[in-house]
Amino acid sequence: MPQYRGDMATCGFIEYNDASPEVRAVYDDIMTTRQTDWINNFWKALAHHPPTLRRTWESIKQIMAPGALDPLVKEMIYVAVSATNQCPYCIASHTASARKAGMTDAMYAELMAVVGMANETNRLASGYQVDVDDRFKT
């Protein structure tokens, strides 16, 4: 039986040495792709259901790969959505990634101001049930 650890995680974490070959393969791909020697807790928690682990990793790997948006923009979007969804883990992990990609304290502060304002005005527009202007319709 795998050894689990994690004070907050519902099911605990599956460490590399305790992982099945299927889970280890995903862990190895994560470490290779990210050029790191460790697996963060999010993946260790998802490892309890290997199909979800693999599907989520493959999707994130594709979405976060080089594209029209640069890595900093993608991480800042992740921080914004994570703040709105109130996910402390995601806020912390993606803030660290955004800082690694070049986000400054000033950029973070401005991002949080935009997130706060967007959430407020979204709630106001929803509460007032504002019809979309014809000019904004696509």
Which stretches of residues belong to each language-model region?
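Hydrophobic alpha-helical segments
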Residues: 1-138
